[in-house]
Amino acid sequence: MKKSFIHQQEEISFVKNTFTQYLIAKLDVVEVQGPILSRVGDGMQDNLSGTENPVSVNVLKIPNATFEVVHSLAKWKRHTLARFGFNEGEGLVVNMKALRPDEDSLDQTHSVYVDQWDWEKVIPDGKRNLAYLKEAVETIYKVIRLTELAVEARYDIEAVLPKKITFIHTEELVAKYPDLTPKERENAITKEFGAVFLIGIGGVLPDGKPHDGRAPDYDDWTTETENGYHGLNGDILVWNGQLGSAFELSSMGIRVDEEALKRQVEMTGDQDRLAFDWHKSLLNGLFPLTIGGGIGQSRMVMFLLRKQHIGEVQTSVWPQEVRDSYDNIL
């Protein structure tokens, strides 16, 4: 039992370390330290889809402030790039750990504990467009494939990912599968191509509903791009043969500029956020134009090691029935 546990931990470390090294080299970012707490009221917390309640923390020696455990570092990263004067084409990556206790499903792929490679880069002049987003997606997908090949060589786990990732807009997807739910659309398109970047998540589609929810103040999901489609963000999805479904590895996008921020908070009714320090800084032109995202660490390990449950590669909390159903939960 001990031997199996140690081997399991060595596999997890190998995937994480290998991916980290490739990501830093190929994406050309520096690894930095990030926070676990965010001060309430400065606007730095990631509100995700807007319905999740963060974990509140009171610090004894700072009685005049309340803090929250971060959901992600989407806004903190952009603030940090500005604070330390990162130039065009430069960026950072953080080994982020977060808690999302309002996760509506604790299942094979969802956990209260979230670990990500959280990255952000300053966009070069004239590159705030769909083509640059696709370049970044292809770079990250290359890192995923290189890591998969390294796992194949070390552990004899057959590589399954296609050489190229397929791009498709959410508007195209709803037209292609009008009678399917968003999740069913993801399953259909990802099973067909093996690896997909789904562009434009957050805005209302022709069927009157968004593909999925997104906060209005980090990703730009409203800017018109090509053929009347909208959105400069999206998700990297791969086909998970173990689960028989699409499997999200990363959410990423070009971040809002001043106009996109104002447009999106008006659409979601979140204009009150513009009073926060972070949002004021953006509106006053103090932040660079950036692109960034989060890549799930435990999800990546789970996929590349062909595990059935995310609890096999991370230590978290689970209902007893989940522990009873899976022998290898950590």
UniProtKB/Swiss-Prot annotation:
Location relative to the cell: Cytoplasm
| Record EC number | 6.3.1.1
Paired cysteines (S-S)? none
Keyword list, A-Z: Amino-acid biosynthesis, Asparagine biosynthesis, ATP-binding, Cytoplasm, Ligase, Nucleotide-binding
Q: Which reaction does it catalyse?
A: L-aspartate + NH4(+) + ATP = L-asparagine + AMP + diphosphate + H(+)
Can you cite a GO biological process for this protein? L-asparagine biosynthetic process
Question: Which Pfam families did the record assign?
Answer: AsnA (PF03590)
* Keyword tRNA processing belongs to the record: no
What SUPFAM superfamilies does this protein's entry cite? Class II aaRS and biotin synthetases
GO molecular function terms listed in the Swiss-Prot or TrEMBL record = aspartate-ammonia ligase activity; ATP binding; catalytic activity, acting on a protein; transferase activity
Give the main EC class.
ligase
Recorded hits in InterPro entries, A to Z, give: aa-tRNA-synth_II, aa-tRNA-synth_II/BPL/LPL, AsnA
Tell me the pathway. Answer: Amino-acid biosynthesis; L-asparagine biosynthesis; L-asparagine from L-aspartate (ammonia route): step 1/1
What are its GO cellular component terms? cytosol
Superkingdom per UniProt: Bacteria
Please name the NCBIfam families in this protein's record: asnA (TIGR00669)
Please report which protein family the annotation says this sequence is part of: Belongs to the class-II aminoacyl-tRNA synthetase family. AsnA subfamily.
Listed name of the protein: Aspartate--ammonia ligase
